[in-house]
Amino acid sequence: MELEDGVVYQEEPGGSGAVMSERVSGLAGSIYREFERLIGRYDEEVVKELMPLVVAVLENLDSVFAQDQEHQVELELLRDDNEQLITQYEREKALRKHAEEKFIEFEDSQEQEKKDLQTRVESLESQTRQLELKAKNYADQISRLEEREAELKKEYNALHQRHTEMIHNYMEHLERTKLHQLSGSDQLESTAHSRIRKERPISLGIFPLPAGDGLLTPDAQKGGETPGSEQWKFQELSQPRSHTSLKVSNSPEPQKAVEQEDELSDVSQGGSKATTPASTANSDVATIPTDTPLKEENEGFVKVTDAPNKSEISKHIEVQVAQETRNVSTGSAENEEKSEVQAIIESTPELDMDKDLSGYKGSSTPTKGIENKAFDRNTESLFEELSSAGSGLIGDVDEGADLLGMGREVENLILENTQLLETKNALNIVKNDLIAKVDELTCEKDVLQGELEAVKQAKLKLEEKNRELEEELRKARAEAEDARQKAKDDDDSDIPTAQRKRFTRVEMARVLMERNQYKERLMELQEAVRWTEMIRASRENPAMQEKKRSSIWQFFSRLFSSSSNTTKKPEPPVNLKYNAPTSHVTPSVKKRSSTLSQLPGDKSKAFDFLSEETEASLASRREQKREQYRQVKAHVQKEDGRVQAFGWSLPQKYKQVTNGQGENKMKNLPVPVYLRPLDEKDTSMKLWCAVGVNLSGGKTRDGGSVVGASVFYKDVAGLDTEGSKQRSASQSSLDKLDQELKEQQKELKNQEELSSLVWICTSTHSATKVLIIDAVQPGNILDSFTVCNSHVLCIASVPGARETDYPAGEDLSESGQVDKASLCGSMTSNSSAETDSLLGGITVVGCSAEGVTGAATSPSTNGASPVMDKPPEMEAENSEVDENVPTAEEATEATEGNAGSAEDTVDISQTGVYTEHVFTDPLGVQIPEDLSPVYQSSNDSDAYKDQISVLPNEQDLVREEAQKMSSLLPTMWLGAQNGCLYVHSSVAQWRKCLHSIKLKDSILSIVHVKGIVLVALADGTLAIFHRGVDGQWDLSNYHLLDLGRPHHSIRCMTVVHDKVWCGYRNKIYVVQPKAMKIEKSFDAHPRKESQVRQLAWVGDGVWVSIRLDSTLRLYHAHTYQHLQDVDIEPYVSKMLGTGKLGFSFVRITALMVSCNRLWVGTGNGVIISIPLTETNKTSGVPGNRPGSVIRVYGDENSDKVTPGTFIPYCSMAHAQLCFHGHRDAVKFFVAVPGQVISPQSSSSGTDLTGDKAGPSAQEPGSQTPLKSMLVISGGEGYIDFRMGDEGGESELLGEDLPLEPSVTKAERSHLIVWQVMYGNE
């Protein structure tokens, strides 16, 4: 970008590349000419003192002018940034406006649809309300009609009762008159003796029945008042009245009359009768059929004329009794009585409405009628009463009776009653019309109210819509005003872009905040790249400023060409010192074409990892590292009162002790004895993991030792078994407890039986190799071979079979002691066909491994090729592994997400026995004979391979038997990132893979407990392997213990006594390997994202480290109590300087407890050793001190006890920092027994400069024997924090190392070995 003033890019004739502006160069030229004139006129001495001052002034002027140019460049960049931000803001604003318009249109359409649906709902609701109103009105009309019908029935019954009472009174009056008139007559005197007069017939006047009738006997015959010869003189009606049918005669419309009849009752063949209800309003005629045809012939018909209008009773009622031809003995008097009865019936209107003509039932109880209990008579039917009175009485009454006067009164009453009824009917009609009118008006009122409500709702909606339209109108006006303002602003195009006010302060603040967030995310990504590759920072190369500083001197040096040798070079100015995170813009020789190239240095370093690393960038990075370590060196060399000895920074307490105690303290310090790159030949090798070889074990269950083809037995084992028998026979519980405690202590000692051999897993881009070294002579690589193409993430040394191992076939539910029987007798086959598929959350997996039995007997030669040892399936799997894995820690973190992509994985949801045909046993692979010399000539390794097993030149039988029992002997287990598990022998034929299997996910950790190997997978499951019946490891049948869902990686495991602690996310699960169950789980950190990364156990405590955390946590091994927190970040910052150097953020990448010390390795290569304090120690060795507390812990699930040792507290006040460190993360610590320098060799107490330095001499009077341990740390690169990068390469401890360029040597994988002398306590 061309500026107004212009930047001159020019080259000096000497090629120095210095740049000077035109003004400064012009000034320099004029001063140069003036100086020439002065020298020509006077002498050089005149300007000799003036020259440095003028040069300094010109340099300052040039630097100021350069700064001015830089500021102008920055200003232009900021203007471009501002322009881009404004353009992006306008685009985003337009897009947002478009989206808001779309949203408004969609909202309007939705609102319209919603309104239509609401209108339909309201119309349906109004229709529903109208229908409900109509139904309600109809129901009201029905109820009113029912009430009216009930009222009419009540009025009818009342009139009927009144009419009956009037008739009764009238008949009584007639009887009294007749009896009074006929009381003196002779006829009555002669006939009075022949009958018994009754004042009144019994209620329900019942006819006497002939003897031949099958009907029931009435109540009147029970009284015995009527003799059989006088049966009321009513033999003319030979049938009872109940068998008489009243039929309508002389009716012009017989059909209509019959339709009006209501057949009220029937008489069955037995003579029973169902009666008419009392609520019947009409006076219906009852038709009573007869039982037999004979009775029908003898039946009398009474035909009653019934007019349509039942209220008119003034018509003639003719009753005609038809008699059939039969023998009757009836006199003329009786015929007269019959005609009188007919006349009375004719003048009695109630016979037209008689309901009780068929009132016989199976009993004498009346079924209907009004019964007057005071007179014990029937007050309803006059006909029944007269029928029972006899014809003589009626004849007596008829004589001299005047019926006309009373008949008129009755007719008048009936006529008046009829008129009243008509009036009432007319009123009822008017009333019903009015009620119907009221109903219609009510219905119309409800409909109008509904319409009014709908109109009100419509009015409210219209008002709301009106308000919305007004609001939209206001918004439209505001937008139009904004548009006018914007058009007015657009006219002011001469205003610069930075001064245009197009957005508010809030919007600008939001944009700036988003930019800052993006910057923070960019810096986080940059930090991640620094962690995974190396800590990067783009800093200016001081060489450019050196050249710029010397360019003016070059320009003016021509003045002193004759006296340049004698002129003293002035010191550089103070203001041009090196600035670490510089932000200067230095114009370079090459012309840069992009805007990014002119960004300041702190911006351009954010993008430097995207470009390829050139030699210049590597050089600048090394220069930056060198400057960083130079500042660390300056900080370390400050006098802070700490003691430096053997490469360690010790606390001040070592000064305060006496000479004897000081030597005793100094002798326990770790002394560095070896330091060198891991492999001189392969410089790209990266360290992953390492472990010391445990060569113990290889015993049968009764203590016998397995060597070659024969089995030898120890006498100690026999004594031990006899002692166990005696112990089991003993009844003393104290003896059992004592023996258990002794066994626990013996197992603790057995765990420390290691050899000095170390297996180190390294990887290149193509494959993973195993290097086997002896810690006593680390420079001599005993053997190296390739394992697989994937990264080996973990390695474990598994001892051989011991007599204390758990039996392989022991049931899971057993919790007793281990049976000391023979190996084969106590083990049962654990094949997939015989075990349960799921044991309480444990999945049993069975793999058919072809060639297992055949591989044990097939002889094979030594020195097998690593490629030949792998089956074809394994090679196919390993070839697909990603090779670009940054570092060990990040790669193991990445396995949680992407390790599940390996093929042929087993479905986790499938329960039951798995049958995996993935790998065959590599023992079955035949090895060519011509490869055997490779094995024999491999770095003099036979001396180490011959510790237990055989040499290549022994007999074939011995070799075969050794191969059979090789898995019974100590082995090495390697877990790869692709899920492959490899088992190699650790005693002989190291290259040969004895067993292998492909598991479901990446293998992150392997531990061994008493004949059980637990393998932690990245999917949150534990694979548990046991030995087979022959003592060899059976990888074809194993158990899977799921730690729960969701599945996450099991990052780390450690053995704590007889249990295994597993780090699973932020939790720690305690697993019992024998029972294969989870005993306890607790949180090691409150946040779920913080994963447990390392576990280290000693005594009764377990130290825990958390990912991306600098705090160590101590937990009790038995009670799981949180005991202590130790933060190492303040200590590291104090020892190595401020946080600008990248040392403030401390990640713990390696953790180990050894030699009564806690060894901590960090992500930036710092190694810290913290002595474990003895203040809280309960008992060192139980029972060796009188009066000391012996702590014993019991298991709540069994009667097992565990001896308490001590709790490994530590304090950062006693922490010791090692000046020997790595340039990148510390990958591992390994502690093995061994001694490089003798304890008698003494040194001057200064720091170590060669292999001959060592700890102070042991006192002759000290009686505690000292053990020597070698502690190995591995990591990328080496740095001495006291020396920085200047002499770090020259101080590598090793005598025969060839000198190589520091560019590659200082950044290779290095091993650092310390020797530690410590006592038994």
Swiss-Prot record:
Annotated region (Disordered), positions in chain: 203-292, 473-500, 563-600, 854-906, 1239-1266
Cellular localisation: Cytoplasm; Cytoplasm, Perinuclear region; Lysosome membrane
Biased composition (Polar residues): 236-253, 266-285, 855-864
Main location as per UniProt: cytoplasm
Tissue specificity: Expressed only in testis on the round spermatids of stage I, II and II. Absent in spermatogonia and spermatocyte.
Biased composition annotated in UniProt, kind: Acidic residues: 874-883
Residues covered by the RH2 domain: 500-571
Residues of the RH1 domain: 7-95
Described function: The JNK-interacting protein (JIP) group of scaffold proteins selectively mediates JNK signaling by aggregating specific components of the MAPK cascade to form a functional JNK signaling module. Regulates lysosomal positioning by acting as an adapter protein which links PIP4P1-positive lysosomes to the dynein-dynactin complex. Assists PIKFYVE selective functionality in microtubule-based endosome-to-TGN trafficking.
UniProt similarity note: Belongs to the JIP scaffold family.
PANTHER family per record: C-JUN-AMINO-TERMINAL KINASE-INTERACTING PROTEIN 4, JNK/SAPK-ASSOCIATED PROTEIN
Record-given protein name: C-Jun-amino-terminal kinase-interacting protein 4
